[in-house]
Amino acid sequence: MHSASVWVSSLTMAAASGWFAATMLAQPATSKEPRFPQLTMDQLNEAQKPLGEQIMKVSSVGLGGPYNPMIRSPVLGQRLYDLFYYLRWQTSVPTKLNEFAILIIGRQWRSQVEWYAHAPLAAKAGLSPDIIAELKASKRPSNMAEDEAVVYDFVTELTTTQKVSDETYAQAKKVFNDQQIVDLTAVAGNYVMVAMMLAMAEETVPPDKEPPFKVGEK
């Protein structure tokens, strides 16, 4: 996961500052009150500050996205942060495939923030723009490499049928070891939880950005 550490430090400062600048802008008069007003570091209490400092070191969205509701429960938030950290930067699954799995969940949930945050990361990690575009269009991507096809089939089958068939598992064993299969399962489940957190909190992309999924889009 050395490649992740190369881009994360530069991405954090630029993206986090941009997210904060956008999310702290005044909302249109017709918009409803946010369920969780965006917090900044100087608003955090003593229980929240240590977690906030950790988040700001690695997050591409600052304290936005799932971190905004999550930090309201700092003990739980710390446990989740530790899980996020492993599944993003220490997982045994290669970065490109890990981000692909996250996008699959983001598309299933039509999670605006999840897709907005992770589509650029997937592309940066080497996932083909065509694969990203076809997935966004709710299609099974064509021209996938063997390991990409395994990720798509494994994650999609597990999350839509609540099981993994012997055939799909056998295909996974051809390209992944036991630890990678466990980590792939965990990242899929984790980002379902992230999508749920984002949906509950009604977190949105920055107001000056276009949501990835249009209203009514299946």
Question: Can you name each region flagged by the protein language model?
Answer:
Residues 22-218:
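Hydrophobic alpha-helical segments
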